[in-house]
Structure formats: structure tokens, C-alpha cells
Amino acid sequence: MTDINHYLGNPLLKKANVPVEWNKDQILEYQKCMQDPLYFCQKYIKIVSLDEGLVPFDVYPFQKEILGTIHNNRFTICKLPRQSGKTTTIISYILHYVLFNEQMRVAILANKAATARDILSRLQLAYENLPKWLQQGVMSWNKGSLDLENGSRIVASSTSSSAVRGGSYNMIFLDEFAFVPHNVAEDF
């Protein structure tokens, strides 16, 4: 791809409306990824390890269970300890969700806007490291939101009573919900 095919000159991002030539193996791989979120996460998601830098996402058994639970249930509540990889698991699933489904609206909400934006930036890092043939073209890309050419959108915001007011969302990820004041939590 030439520079004009990249979003704002970023060679890691495919610009919207850029045709991609697929070979047979890529078509089969795309179908496999579309049908199996776990396969997609294990094969294509990259994360930052504090010790090793950028590495493939090594999915633990409890994370496999979380992915299956989220994929097969409309509502999911997970009560998990800190630093267990739950956010990495969820953002991997969110990425799968918006890539392989059109017109999806996802809200990432956390007790602080900075936390929500950090989660979105981790998702964006994983997105940048996908092969171009797996990427949807990028319409907009910033610290607070991501819009893809398939009509899917992800927004990051602090958890407040007005955070998602006026919008319709297919998925809402509430991180650090224990730190949200009870009067705000009741609005959800």
C-alpha cells in the first residue's frame, strides 16, 4: 500500500475506501476469524507486555471462558481481580465485534475519562498491528473515539449519568465500576 492508502499517513492504518486484493488463504482466514472470536484473538491480537514489549496475546483458560461467555450472552457481568488481563480480553473481543459486524456502537466507560481513553488506546494499538486485509478502513481515529468504514464506532468516556445519553449502543463496557459513585451507577 502506498502512503495515500494509509489513514493520515500512518502506515499501520488502512484508509477508508481503499480496495484490498484478497487471496484464497486470506478469504478462508477472514471467515475463520469472523466465526471464532477466540481464534481471532489468539492469532491476531498483539498486546504490550511490561517485560517483553509487543507480543501476541497469550489467552489463558479463564480468558477463553470470558470470551465465550461474552460472545454467547447478551448481558455479562464479570467480577475479577485487578491486573488479571480482563481489560485486554474485553478489548480483544470489542475489536472482533466492530470488525466483523456492521454499524456497531460500542461505549468504553470508566470511572475517569483518562482510564477510558487508555483502554481505547490499547484497542487502537491492537488494531494497528492487524494485517491490512483484516482491517476496516479508518474514517476517524482520535483519543476519544474510533470510526470505521463499516459504520462501527467506539467511544471512550468517563462513567457519568450523561456519558451515553442520547446514543444507542450495542455494547457498553464498564471498567472500574466499583469506583463509580452509587448515585451514578444506579443510572445504568
Residue ranges of model-derived segments:
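Phosphate/NTP-binding elements of NTP-utilizing enzymes
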Residues: 1-188
